[in-house]
Amino acid sequence: MDTTGRLHHRKHATPVEDRSPTTPKASDALPLPLYLTNAVFFTLFFSVAYYLLHRWRDKIRNSTPLHIVTLSEIVAIVSLIASFIYLLGFFGIDFVQSFIARASHDVWDLEDTDPNYLIDEDHRLVTCPPANISTKTTIIAAPTKLPTSEPLIAPLVSEEDEMIVNSVVDGKIPSYSLESKLGDCKRAAAIRREALQRMTRRSLEGLPVEGFDYESILGQCCEMPVGYVQIPVGIAGPLLLNGREYSVPMATTEGCLVASTNRGCKAIYLSGGATSVLLKDGMTRAPVVRFASATRAAELKFFLEDPDNFDTLAVVFNKSSRFARLQGIKCSIAGKNLYIRFSCSTGDAMGMNMVSKGVQNVLEFLQSDFSDMDVIGISGNFCSDKKPAAVNWIEGRGKSVVCEAIIKEEVVKKVLKTNVASLVELNMLKNLAGSAVAGALGGFNAHAGNIVSAIFIATGQDPAQNVESSHCITMMEAVNDGKDLHISVTMPSIEVGTVGGGTQLASQSACLNLLGVKGANKESPGSNSRLLAAIVAGSVLAGELSLMSAIAAGQLVKSHMKYNRSSKDMSKAAS
C-alpha cells in the first residue's frame, strides 16, 4: 500500500445525517418524463379552458344560468384547476426562485453573437452561467477540539514512518533533512506534512500532496514541501501578434480576467493584429562596495566607465557562462559608497544567477588594483530587483518591449461597445494624468499587472518580478481622421526566461510549449525568451484595451449595482 496514500484521510467527527423528507415537486404529479408531464398538463389546461368557454357561450345564448353545470363541466372545471395548480407550481415558484438566485449572476445583454463580457475596475468579467444555488438546509457538525494525543489523519502505514514523524515532532530530526535521509522526496513530503499537522493541530486536508513530482523541485524550486497549490489556467486568444497567432495561458483566481483579455484579443484580431518591437535585452545586477573615502570610490567609477577598460572587464565577466555577454556598466556614488550596475545578455534564461556569477568574477578581478575595496553586498538595490524603481523605468531591465495596434472604428463600436473619442479622453485622464496625480512610478496603465502575473504563474516565471515587469505606459490616440484608435503599451522591464527556475515544472513547461517557447532555442539563443516577452506585452495590450473600453462605456457602476459579487461571496461564506 502507498505510504502517503492514506495521508488524505482525516479522522472526522460523525456527521449529523440529514433525515428531512424530500420536498415534493410539481413535476412528481405523473410518473413520466418531465417533458411529457408538462405536455399533458399544458394540453389539459388549454383544452378544458376552451371547452368551458365554449359551453358558457352557449349558455349565454340560450339564457341558461351559468351556475347550473353538468357532470362533464364539473370534470372540466376540476381538470382546469388541477392543471393550473400544476403549472403554477412548476413554473411560477421555480421561476421566482431562479430569478432571485440569478439576480447577481446574469451577464450583460450585449449585441454580439459571441460570449458576453462584463468588466469592472478589478477586471472581473462574467461569462460563465450562474452556479446552481441549493436552497436545501443542511446541518453541519460543530467543530470539535482535536485531542492532542491523536494524529489529525490516519496513522502512516509503516512503523518506521510513524517513528520518523514522532522524531520530527520531537525535534530529533530536522524537517529540512528528510529528503537527504530518506532518499525519497515524495515520502519526505508526506512525513513532513503529517508532522506539521500534529505540531500545529491544524489540518492540511484541502492541500493536495499526491500527483506531483517532488524530485523535480529538489534543490531548485522549493524547500521543505508539504504539497502544492492548484491554480486554474484559462486561455485567452488567439492573439494575433507579428503575423502569428498565440493562445495565451493565464493562471489566475480572479474571475473574468481571462475573458476580459480574450475580448481584447478579439478586437486586435479583427483589426489586423498587433506589432511588437524589442528595444533592449539585458539583465542587471548592482553590487555595493565601500572605500575609505569618496575620492577613492570615484576613482573606481571612472575606471569602470572608461571605454578602454570595457573589453578587459567583459572577458572576466563572460567567463561565468557561454550565454552571458556583458553589455554595459553604470555607476552611482553615495558618499564613499559605489553602486555598480552591470547589464548583460543571458540567452533564454531570465539570468539573475548568470549575471550574479559574472559580477562576482569582476569584483574578484578588481581586488588586485583596488585592494581597499570592501564588498558590502552582491546586490545593492541599484539593480533593481522585485521592487518599483525609477532606474528600471528609465534604463530598463530584462526585455524592453513596445507593442501597438490600430483598432478599427467598427470593432471599437461592435466588440468594445464604445467609441474612439471616449477611449482617448479616458486614457489621458486616467492612465496619464490620474497616475501622475497618484505619484505612480511605472504605473501609467489600467491593469498591466493583472495580465503579467497571470502569464508569469502559468509559464513558471518569478511572480515577485511582476513588480517591475508590470511597469507600463498605455498610450491611445485617434488616427485616420479620428475614425480608428491607435493603442500602444511600452514596457521597459519584462523579466522572463524559458529555461531554469519554475519553467522546468511539468505544468509550466506545458504552457510554454503551447506558446512555442519551451526551453532554449539552440539555433538562436535568447529568441524564445524574447518572444515570450513580446507575447506578454501583446496580452497586456489586449487587457488594457478591454478594460478601458468597459470603463469608457460606463459599465462599472452598472456592473457593481447589478452584480453584487462581494455580497454573494459573503453569503456563501456564511452558509
UniProtKB/Swiss-Prot annotation:
Name of the molecule in the record: 3-hydroxy-3-methylglutaryl-coenzyme A reductase 1
Gene Ontology terms, MF aspect: hydroxymethylglutaryl-CoA reductase (NADPH) activity
Protein family according to the UniProt entry: Belongs to the HMG-CoA reductase family.
InterPro entries with a match to the protein in the record: HMG_CoA_Rdtase, HMG_CoA_Rdtase_cat_sf, HMG_CoA_Rdtase_CS, HMG_CoA_Rdtase_eu_arc, HMG_CoA_Rdtase_N, HMG_CoA_Rdtase_NAD(P)-bd_sf, HMG_CoA_Rdtase_sub-bd_dom_sf
Catalytic activity: (R)-mevalonate + 2 NADP(+) + CoA = (3S)-3-hydroxy-3-methylglutaryl-CoA + 2 NADPH + 2 H(+)
Positions of the catalytic residues: 254, 386, 462, 560
Gene Ontology CC, one term: peroxisomal membrane
Biased composition (Basic residues): 1-13
Transmembrane segments: 29-49, 73-93, 531-551
Pathway it works in: Metabolic intermediate biosynthesis; (R)-mevalonate biosynthesis; (R)-mevalonate from acetyl-CoA: step 3/3
Keywords: Endoplasmic reticulum, Glycoprotein, Isoprene biosynthesis, Membrane, Mitochondrion, NADP, Oxidoreductase, Plastid, Transmembrane, Transmembrane helix
Organism name: Hevea brasiliensis (Para rubber tree)
Compartment list: Endoplasmic reticulum membrane; Mitochondrion membrane; Plastid membrane
Enzyme class name: oxidoreductase
The keyword Nucleus is annotated on this UniProt entry: no
Membrane-related topology note: Multi-pass membrane protein
Positions of the UniProt region annotated as Disordered: 1-25
Gene that this sequence comes from: HMGR1
Positions of the UniProt region annotated as Linker: 97-160
Stretches for region Catalytic: 161-575
EC number: 1.1.1.34
Function: Catalyzes the synthesis of mevalonate. The specific precursor of all isoprenoid compounds present in plants.
Signal sequence, start to end: none
GO biological process, alphabetically ordered: coenzyme A metabolic process; isoprenoid biosynthetic process; sterol biosynthetic process
The organism's place on the tree of life at top rank: Eukaryota
Positions annotated with a glycan in the UniProt record: 132, 318, 564
